[in-house]
Amino acid sequence: PLTAFAGSIGFIGIALIFSLSTGVNAYIADMERSTLSEYPLQILSSGVDITSFLSSGSSGGTTATGLPTDEDGKKDTSGGVEGMVSVRQLITKMVSGLTSNDLTSLKKYLDSDESTIADDATSIEYSYSVSPQIYRQDADGSVHQVNPDSTLSMLGLGSSGPGSTSVTSSLMNSMGSNTSVFYQLPANSALYKSQYEVKAGRWPEKPTECVAVLSKYGTVTDYALYSMGLRDSAELDKMIQQFAQNQNVDVPSEFRSYRYDELMGLKFKLVNSADTYVYDDTYGIWKSKADDKDYMKQLVENGEDITIVGIVQPDYTASASMLTSGIAYPASLTEKVMKDAADSDIVKQQMADPATN
């Protein structure tokens, strides 16, 4: 009996250890998936050799021109010739570290039967330098472009020009370097759906549907409120004007909470960027009408509706959340925008004759 009892304890111990091991391995695997969903491996059209860039910042990592040489023919970096200014290669080192990636060939390979990367990857996503032209139409008939949104650019944010400072850079970093409330959802919904709880409505099912993404605390930014029309955009315009004129900025202090049904069903307008051009028969060129307020007002009015059909928030049990707070539209909208552009007369003419203006 003692032997049998001891043996049963041994089996129980082994079972417990095995269960713990399996649980720990599953937890580690889940953490790895969650982390990679937030920080995926990205291959861009161009890259830079960081080691070359970093080494250019120190004298030991660069080649100086005009320095004396020792008897072995090596540069003497202990000091230059008195009365002479030597050269430290900085920009040339940086440029030599730049590389260009052939993404067209890479995509062909990934889509071919030769590639086995898809077997080991959760998803392969493609992004394009295409941004849907989205407008908000207010009750008074005025229109405001909300994507791409140039509001923060007016404040000197999101740029690296002479007006940018460490303060604006810090602000942009805190906003995730995103100067627009709108952004595209990953094409593979399995990457993010399990990380979020649907608080109202549903996830987008059509190209012209979008979802409001809350922070883990259930909040949206005041910037998003202006984009959605829940706060008067004239208030924001006034702050920008005061800032531009170096005046004291009147910042609103009162903000209220919003019910889900106040966000649900909000509509925006999609405009085909090709439609902002009209052909001039007299000069035989395409002219932009983007600055013509009456033309743009009519164009926006005739645009397709983009509707918020859901509100989501990070699940409190999720170890990571890959979406940022704002308004997310499906990848199918980007595909629609590209197709509509390809079908336009101006693009067809330019494809047939690149010299077309």
Kindly give the residue locations of the regions a language model identified:
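N-terminal Sec/SRP start-transfer signal
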Residues: 1-11
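Mobile, glycine-rich extracellular loop/lid and propeptide segments
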Residues: 1, 14, 194
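Alpha-helical transmembrane segments
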Residues: 12-42, 46, 50
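Basic-flanked hydrophobic alpha-helices used for secretion and membrane insertion
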Residues: 33, 45, 49-357
